[in-house]
């Protein structure tokens, strides 16, 4: 089974779409999975949406009492994961979920660790591009 860890902060408006898209991509590829949303102390409806999504099965949620940062959310999600393989993806779908399938297949082929990044930074503001380097 694959565990997909999804750190989120104030992303209540997009959670249903995120869960639906990721589950659809993995279902189409016949990959069994669990989704673990980690709410990093959101101030909006994020936790309520995660709780509602969890009722459908295959989705779990973790909730921080305050904002501890994305890295802490990722670590908490990885610690809670039950899968043989884990994948971390942002909750706003800025990265294509189809890459999960590609990387999962590489893992099945014997790779132990994988990572991804943007091939092109696109039209980001100069300060953001500088900070990312």
Model-derived segments and their meaning:
Residues 39-47, 93-94:
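A conserved acidic beta->alpha catalytic loop
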Residues 23, 31-41, 62-63:
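Short beta-strand/loop segment that forms part of the nucleotide-sugar
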Residues 13-17, 43-53:
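Acidic helix N-cap motif at the loop->helix transition within catalytic regions
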Residues 26-31, 54-59:
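Short helix-capping segments at alpha-helix termini
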Residues 1-3, 34:
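Cell-envelope/extracellular polymer assembly enzymes that use nucleotide-activated donors
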Residues 60-66, 70-80, 85, 94-133:
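Acceptor/aglycone-binding surface of glycosyltransferases and processive sugar-polymer synthases
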Residues 11-26:
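Short, well-formed alpha-helical segments that are part of the catalytic scaffolds
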